[in-house]
UniProtKB/Swiss-Prot annotation:
It is found in: Cell membrane. Interacts with CtaA. This is Protoheme IX farnesyltransferase. GO terms for molecular function: protoheme IX farnesyltransferase activity. It catalyses: heme b + (2E,6E)-farnesyl diphosphate + H2O = Fe(II)-heme o + diphosphate. Converts heme B (protoheme IX) to heme O by substitution of the vinyl group on carbon 2 of heme B porphyrin ring with a hydroxyethyl farnesyl side group. The chain crosses the membrane at residues 26-46, 48-68, 110-130, 147-167, 174-194, 220-240, 243-263, 276-296. GO terms for cellular component: plasma membrane. Its EC number is 2.5.1.141. The lineage of its organism: Bacteria, Bacillati, Bacillota, Clostridia, Eubacteriales.
Amino acid sequence: MFAQARDRLQSGQVVRDYVALTKPRIVILLLITGFAAMWVAAGGPPPLGLTVVTMIGLALSCGAANAINMWYDRDIDAVMARTRRRPLPAGRLTPEQALRFGVITGALSFLVLLTVNLLTALLATAGLLFYVLVYTMWLKRSTVHNIVIGGAAGAAPPLVGWAAVTGRLDWAAVIMFLVVFLWTPPHFWALALFRSEDYERAGVPMLPVVRGERATKWQILLYSLLLIPSAALLYWTGTVGRLYLWTSVVLGCAMVSASVGLLRERAPQMDWAHRTYGWSLLYLFVIFLAMMLDVTRA
């Protein structure tokens, strides 16, 4: 009986480790942007069956990208305090298991999304490959611009969601992509500010490590400013109304305000770095929620 209980506990841990490979919190955030794009493209709630299939396929694609990322980054994950307890550096899964899981999950995502339409499947796969081949295997360890260029992968879900409903890409989808693309650097640079010692130890050339805190804070402010007009552009596509417009402006101004507070903060204080990081998460959630609410009112 005790052996059976132990086996069940071990099986449960293995399942949790495979789920951890997908970085579920990140996947949920990406699914929110993809679902919001579907909602806006449909002018309201999209068909239930289409939504379920698209969300499953997109979740598989994002999870596969994250799993292969963990496989490739297992050496630096073992060095960083934030990541050393992940399944691979902790020795709970082997590299072969992680890679096999990522490849199979990625292939399944393509097959699932192919039942929606070819464009949707290709866009999700392009995002996966860009994240793995361009960001993870090239940019992350070689350039200070890693997160700027690599952010294109994380901005792909709105394109996937839009294509699932319409079978094409429109300017509204491109603007949603742009919002996530511009949001990504200040979000991750805020994290990098209070994790800079980790990144330096691992040899990852994040902006605070290479250029210093002051330069990073100015870049966060710059991208936060760019978010305001970029997010507002969606209003002029006619897909959302003034509720969204003013919400995006208020959220953008709050993001800028947090960035100014961050700029004024002096080391070793990191209160505003944590606040900016947390606010950026709220910003992305609320702005995509505003898109959905306003298109419902239209």
